[in-house]
């Protein structure tokens, strides 16, 4: 799997203190994911909660199949998770 994003729309480093490349680290561990069905985006968007180093992040992405069969995970947005999202991720990934 490879990652991509629109560099012109990525204001994350300046506005949020991290870039999309940093945000891809959440996929190295367990993520809590749900489909974003709030409206029709013309594509299947997924909201993923996870951790990159010591930071809880929420990343919105869509998967696109490449001609080679490889998956291109296109990052749409990334931000620090809010309290509710951090608690949901912790609950979902904690051992009983």
Describe the role of every protein-language-model region.
Residues 1-96:
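Ribonuclease/tRNase effector modules and their secretory precursors
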